[in-house]
UniProtKB/Swiss-Prot annotation:
PANTHER family: FAD-BINDING DOMAIN-CONTAINING PROTEIN-RELATED (PTHR46720:SF3), HYDROXYLASE, PUTATIVE (AFU_ORTHOLOGUE AFUA_3G01460)-RELATED (PTHR46720)
Parts forming coiled coils: none
Molecular function GO labels: FAD binding; salicylate 1-monooxygenase activity
The encoding gene: nahG
EC nos: 1.14.13.1
Name the record gives this protein: Salicylate hydroxylase
Cofactor(s) this protein cannot do without: FAD
Keyword vocabulary terms for this entry: Aromatic hydrocarbons catabolism, FAD, Flavoprotein, Monooxygenase, NAD, Oxidoreductase, Plasmid
Enzyme class: oxidoreductase
Length: 435
């Protein structure tokens, strides 16, 4: 056979980290014959820390675009009729008085993390995932990467995608390659008590306390000074996910003890004491006998997500606070963006630097804005915004439309811009799509 017609070897893509976005990316990429995908997970099996997770309309579009819509909708919850358009109702923490609602147009979409992960795992072909593989070192040798793992094994690839979480080992490699200092996660000063409540139990508690059962069915957010509480249903309404946030603003740069775990068991009394004076919302917390306490950390905005042939996605790149329900969604947007480009048969080892440059240029500014506004949103919830303060009417008005820019972001336009940079799409095609 003529060498010019010889089939090119498949591009070797290694994904380090098997959470929702890493697994979603692997599932999308492994469908393409020009890609050889391997997923490396440090744990002995796939698993997600946490319970319920909420997705905005933008994240749901990414899920569908990745070809995972059917798996998602089989396990996801939606706000029931006639409140199907509501994302959250906003209420005063002291007495649950109604302050307003945010209308997403598609309502709240939420899922138990473990359920969604299990649904994805069922579709992963054999031979893609390897477990107990914790990456410790990366060496670039020409156009090839050598990944070393703690167990002494190695893997050689053309592209490495780091989705290894907020404590990412690969982030140091990327930042050092850019001549930047290593960035550690930072404690936000906010902790969250988390628990899951049987919806029937919660209904009974609300009946006893004379609280409208509507608050069980529709996602709620109770707002107060230095704290807020959110609820939304999961597992087809059988369970209500509860997260109660409390913030200490006594230190301008709060720290968490280096030897203290980020997640620990807590007592109900400790949680109730943190929300003394919160009225009806305490009836909700009284249904959680053994909460867990989470010390919430995030990352500073990174100066870059890419070095050489290594790219960071998800929490490894932009770990953020949960106040906009956007962290997991941003990881899925990263996955969608890369899947649309890497899945093109014109992707090859020679144009990977250009492709990754487009990813960094087009995804990073948006993800950084989400990180930044998430912190601001938390201050708004807890009546600490420097302009709005405790003006509850104004808080409700702002929250009604605050997330529109996030939910309506046109990720396909970003992909089209990247394809234009790659020479894969003409200006006329983009104009036609936007017109």
């Amino acid at each position: 056979m003529n060498d010019m017609n010889a089939k090119k070897p498949a591009l070797r893509v290694a994904i380090v980290g098997g959470g929702i976005s890493g697994l979603a990316l692997a599932l999308s990429l492994c469908k393409h014959s020009h890609l050889n995908v391997q997923l490396f997970e440090a744990a002995p099996a796939f698993g997600e820390v946490g319970a319920g997770v909420s997705f905005g309309p933008n994240a749901v579009r990414a899920i569908v675009g990745l070809g995972l819509g059917q798996a998602y909708f089989q396990v996801a919850d939606r706000t029931p009729q006639p409140w199907e358009d509501i994302w959250f109702e906003w209420r005063r923490g002291s007495d649950a008085s109604y302050l307003g609602a945010t209308i997403a147009g598609v309502g709240q979409s939420s899922v138990h993390r473990a359920d969604f992960l299990d649904a994805l795992v069922k579709h992963l072909p054999e031979g893609i995932a390897q477990f107990r593989k914790r990456a410790t070192q990366i060496e670039q040798q020409g156009d090839e990467l050598q990944v070393l793992f703690r167990d002494g094994t190695e893997y050689r690839c053309d592209l490495l995608i780091g989705r290894d979480g907020i404590k990412s080992a690969l982030r140091s490699y990327v930042l050092e390659g850019q001549g930047q200092d290593h960035l550690e996660p930072r404690f936000s000063g906010t902790c969250a008590y988390r628990g899951m409540v049987d919806s029937l139990q919660l209904r009974e508690a609300y009946r006893i306390n004379g609280i409208d059962e509507h608050l069980v069915d529709v996602p709620q957010m109770y707002l107060g000074l230095y704290g807020h509480i959110l609820t939304f249903p999961v597992r087809k309404g059988r369970i209500v996910n509860v997260v109660a946030f409390t913030s200490d603003r006594s230190q301008p740069e709060p720290t968490w003890p280096a030897d203290a775990p980020w997640v620990r068991e807590a007592s109900q009394r400790e949680m109730l004491d943190a929300f003394a004076g919160w009225g009806d919302a305490r009836a909700l917390l009284e249904c959680i006998p053994a909460p867990t306490l989470w010390a919430l950390h995030d990352l500073p905005e990174l100066p870059g997500y890419v070095h050489g042939r290594v790219a960071l996605i998800g929490d490894a790149a932009h770990a953020m606070l949960p106040h906009q329900g956007a962290g997991a969604g941003q990881g899925l947007e990263d996955a969608y963006f890369l899947a649309r480009l890497l899945g093109d048969s014109r992707t090859e080892t020679g144009n990977l630097p250009e492709l990754l440059g487009a990813y960094d240029d087009l995804r990073r500014p948006h993800a950084c804005r989400v990180q930044r506004t998430t912190v601001e949103t938390g201050e708004l919830y807890e009546l600490r915004d420097p302009i709005v303060g405790a003006d509850e009417q104004l808080v409700g008005e702002i929250l009604a439309t605050r997330f529109d820019w996030l939910w309506n972001h046109d990720l396909d336009a970003d992909v089209a811009e990247a394809r234009l940079r790659m020479g894969w799409e003409a200006h006329e095609q983009i104009a036609l799509r936007q017109g």
